[in-house]
A protein has these predicted regions:
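Conserved PLP-enzyme active-site core in the AAT-like
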Residues: 1-100
């Protein structure tokens, strides 16, 4: 009714997927989630989190807000490089049952 975006706190997203057996799509955009703060830190990564925009209507505005707030890191590529290994061979799901 008010067209507010629905945000999902994904700090333990991998744990929830592993525990329930549902697909990431079922848990997020198919359930109406517009944005997820995808956390990998609590599942074995070092300081690696990402904002995933599932609804393109919010993409451009969010990018501008992030820049205005100063949330751009000059060496972010080193932090985000962890995600390549994290998603390879479903490592993120294999680690999830052992996360906090």
């Amino acid at each position: 009714r008010h067209k507010l975006p629905l945000h999902m706190d994904g700090a333990r997203f991998a744990n929830a997927i592993a525990a329930t057996g549902v697909s990431p799509a079922e848990m997020t955009w198919k359930s109406g989630v517009d944005l997820i703060s995808f956390g990998a830190t609590k599942n074995g990564c070092w300081m690696a989190d990402a904002v995933v925009i599932l609804n393109p209507d919010f993409g451009k505005e969010l990018r501008l807000l992030r820049q205005r707030a100063g949330q751009t890191f000059s060496k972010a590529r080193f932090i985000s490089a962890q995600f390549e290994a994290y998603f390879t061979d479903e490592l993120w799901l294999r680690m999830a049952p052992h996360g906090n």
